[in-house]
Amino acid sequence: MHAGVRGKKERAKFVWPLLGAGLLLAAEGVAWASGGGGEHGGGHLNWSDFLARTLVFVITFSILFKLLKKPIAGFFSSRKAEIQRLLSELELKQKEAEQNHAECKAKLAALEVETKKIVDELIAEGEVERQKIIEAAEKQADYLRQQADVAIQQEIKAAREKLKLEISELSVAAAEEILRKNMKAKDQDRLVRDFMKRVVEAK
């Protein structure tokens, strides 16, 4: 907004001097045209008129130079200052953009490091959990093996006891069968007497 107002003021400084210079040149042109007919009619150069026109031209040029010198110098000076200001702003924005880029790059690098750290921690935690599961499975397998060994030992012991009992029963039955076959009546009487005697002695 301020730049637009300043630009209008700068243009106004040029318009009025140019308008005045245009009026002077127009007046000089009219004077030149009015004097031109006499020159063509007479066929010789009118030095007084030539000098007057030259003087008017010099005065006009001097006035224009004086009027336009400062506005033109001011215009170019202001334009130079404006360009320098724009360049400074552009350089500042470029530095800000580079700084933002560097900050974003640093944040991205930090994010990558943090992400890798989290991934490594998760992998380590997973490895720990996996090791715990393996250890628990091994303990459970050992416990089951021990239980199986105990059960097998108990079954073996029971089988042995049963076998011993069966052998004892078979031995007794075989002995009874042998005794029945080989024992005579007098032997039976003797065994009965011995048994009764032991019973009496025990009492």
Swiss-Prot record:
The keyword Transmembrane applies. Its main location: membrane. GO terms for molecular function: proton-transporting ATP synthase activity, rotational mechanism; proton-transporting ATPase activity, rotational mechanism. It is found in: Cell inner membrane. It is a single-pass membrane protein. The keyword NAD does not apply. GO terms for cellular component: plasma membrane; proton-transporting ATP synthase complex. It comes from the Bacteria. Pfam families: ATP-synt_B (PF00430). F(1)F(0) ATP synthase produces ATP from ADP in the presence of a proton or sodium gradient. F-type ATPases consist of two structural domains, F(1) containing the extramembraneous catalytic core and F(0) containing the membrane proton channel, linked together by a central stalk and a peripheral stalk. During catalysis, ATP synthesis in the catalytic domain of F(1) is coupled via a rotary mechanism of the central stalk subunits to proton translocation. Component of the F(0) channel, it forms part of the peripheral stalk, linking F(1) to F(0). Belongs to the ATPase B chain family. This is ATP synthase subunit b. The lineage of its organism: Bacteria, Pseudomonadati, Thermodesulfobacteriota, Syntrophobacteria, Syntrophobacterales.
